[in-house]
């Protein structure tokens, strides 16, 4: 089979190498999945480039650990073979999910993974759509509903609104009749307005932490500013929720959050993702035409190195999706 291997950190177009390798064999409670579609995510960028540097403490200081040699954390595909203890699926089942709690490896034609990493794919969504949902949609839902405790008619800002999480977060916020401002690069603003944002800002031209607008809830997909700046634009009892970003800013929040509780009624949170939680609920919204998948692509399997670089450059509109075995 073909798979993308990485041995050293670096430029995705250089270090992601397409190789021929043996098809893996499922052990115990693993299943072998024929990968039909995968996506590009923040972990894929970090595993490939070693950036932000703090992620090297997780993935390997000088090079990715051997088990991370094949990146890829979201998958939609077909069960091809069962390990001896696998009981949740049968051969031929269509499955999908965020596999990051159990490992990586979806930048390949076949993937072996613990059966608990996946769920049955609904019949009414394509493999490409299914691959785009698990990580981004659950992050958006957990960030807004579970952590941010969104309420009707709130004023919300999404920093990084033009990406995969941002596009799902917009749609979920609109279910609560929220007024939603999106922040991203100027090249994405027209598409973001078409998706339904009430207001869009080019972060290169306007610093939303210095204008007169204030917000009940901020969902931060970038975490690229100081907490003190967000404090200025949060309304009393407002909530700031980070889903990831620059390691220095994330560490700042971990250390400062207890201090902020002492003198402010504004709340600062980080999402600790529960992978694949509420996929059935998210599918019900999709089925009722309440949300849709904003797909950047799909691109062909040979475009993965280019697509990882596209993600890192922040040029994607929605979720970058790769067709593997169409």
PLM regions with names:
Residues 94, 155, 238-239:
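Short glycine-centered segments of the SAM/dcSAM-binding site in methyltransferase folds
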Residues 131-202:
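Mid-domain Rossmann-like dinucleotide-binding core that forms the NAD(H)/NADP(H) cofactor-binding site
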Residues 274-326:
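C-terminal hydrophobic helical "lid"/dimerization subdomain
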Residues 22-39, 53-102:
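Glycine-rich beta-strand-centered segment in the early N-terminal region that forms part
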Residues 102-115:
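A structural motif shared across PLP-dependent enzymes of the aminotransferase-like
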Residues 210-217:
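A short acidic, Gly/Pro-enriched loop at the edge of an enzyme's catalytic core
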């Amino acid at each position: 089979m073909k798979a993308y291997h990485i041995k050293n950190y670096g430029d995705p177009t250089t270090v992601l190498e397409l190789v021929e390798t043996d098809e893996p064999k499922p052990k115990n409670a693993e299943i072998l999945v024929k990968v039909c579609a995968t996506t590009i995510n923040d972990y894929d960028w970090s595993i490939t480039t070693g950036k932000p540097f703090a992620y090297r403490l997780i993935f390997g200081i000088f090079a990715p650990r051997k088990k991370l040699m094949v990146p890829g954390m979201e998958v939609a595909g077909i069960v091809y073979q069962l390990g001896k203890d696998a009981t949740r699926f049968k051969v031929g089942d269509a499955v999908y999910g965020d596999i990051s709690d159990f490992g990586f490896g979806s930048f390949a034609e076949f993937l072996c993974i613990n059966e608990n990493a996946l769920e049955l794919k609904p019949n009414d969504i394509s493999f490409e759509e299914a691959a785009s949902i698990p990580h981004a949609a659950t992050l958006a839902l957990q960030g807004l509903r579970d952590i941010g405790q969104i309420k009707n008619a709130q004023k919300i800002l999404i920093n990084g609104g033009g990406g995969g999480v941002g596009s799902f977060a917009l749609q979920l916020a609109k279910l609560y009749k929220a007024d939603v401002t999106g922040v991203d690069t100027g090249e994405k603003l027209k598409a973001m307005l078409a998706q339904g944002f009430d207001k869009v800002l080019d972060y290169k031209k306007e610093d939303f932490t210095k204008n007169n607008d204030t917000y009940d809830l901020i969902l931060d997909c970038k975490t690229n500013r100081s907490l003190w700046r967000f404090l200025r634009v949060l309304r009393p009892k407002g909530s700031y929720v980070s889903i990831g970003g620059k390691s220095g800013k994330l560490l700042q929040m971990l250390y400062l959050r207890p201090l902020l509780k002492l003198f402010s009624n504004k709340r600062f949170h980080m999402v600790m993702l529960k992978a694949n939680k509420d996929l059935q609920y998210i599918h019900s919204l999709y089925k009722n035409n309440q949300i849709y998948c904003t797909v950047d692509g799909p691109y062909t399997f040979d475009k993965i190195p280019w697509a990882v670089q596209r993600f890192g450059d922040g040029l994607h509109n929605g979720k970058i999706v790769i067709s593997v075995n169409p």
